[in-house]
């Protein structure tokens, strides 16, 4: 059973909580935290699951087994999560985003590094660096859904592309991505990509609709 908070006030409890109004709390540990209203955590929080349908701001770190964001989430510190499912807008201003698995059909922005074993994105990602084992980013053209969130948050300067300085993983598949460097074993550079440099040690496929400045490494080029 969830402890439900509505209206304005300060949340001072742990456990299972649901927020429907405007609530501020100092941080703490939760089993499950659901945000349907406007919620601000003044400190770091730990939760088994964090479900955001409203607007959530954390002024510290966030650590959870599961993050499900259908609303707008801003994290001033670091984000550590086993699985993140992002259909809304999530912005992380700390040094690092760490996850086992990230699924992004919305918008994910990170001020610095995203580190995840698996990243599957049909939305948009903006970060300085992404490292992992398997990275799939298929960002291509704006939709009405994304445009709405981008107007609210201005999460990306160019919403037609995901923009990452460095992408490094064993397996990489990209579409609609701008990157300075892409390093990996097996790489697919799809249409609407603009990549300055690709370092590939396995197989490499480059779509005719992509722009790649330089290719280095021992890659086997395939069509």
For the regions a protein language model found, what residue spans apply to each?
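Extended beta-solenoid/beta-helix repeat architectures
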Residues: 1-223
């Amino acid at each position: 059973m969830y402890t439900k908070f509505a209206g304005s006030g300060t949340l001072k409890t742990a456990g299972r909580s649901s927020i429907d109004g405007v609530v501020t709390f100092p941080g703490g540990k939760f089993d499950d935290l659901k945000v349907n209203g406007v919620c601000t955590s003044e400190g770091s929080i730990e939760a088994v699951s964090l479900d955001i349908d409203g607007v959530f701001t954390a002024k510290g770190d966030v650590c959870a087994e599961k993050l499900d964001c259908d609303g707008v989430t801003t994290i001033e510190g670091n984000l550590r999560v086993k699985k993140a499912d992002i259909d809304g807008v999530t912005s992380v201003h700390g040094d690092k985003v760490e996850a086992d698995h990230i699924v992004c059909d919305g918008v994910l922005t990170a001020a610095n590094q995203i580190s995840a074993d698996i990243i599957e994105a049909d939305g948009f990602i903006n970060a300085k660096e992404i490292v992992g084992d398997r990275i799939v980013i298929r960002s291509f053209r704006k939709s009405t859904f994304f445009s709405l969130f981008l107007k609210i948050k201005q999460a990306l300067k160019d919403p037609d592309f995901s923009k990452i300085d460095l992408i490094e993983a064993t397996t990489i598949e990209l579409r609609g991505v701008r990157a300075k460097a892409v390093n990996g074993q097996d790489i697919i550079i799809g249409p609407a990509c603009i990549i300055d440099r690709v370092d590939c040690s396995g197989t490499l496929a480059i779509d005719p609709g992509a722009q790649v400045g330089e290719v280095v490494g021992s890659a086997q080029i395939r069509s």
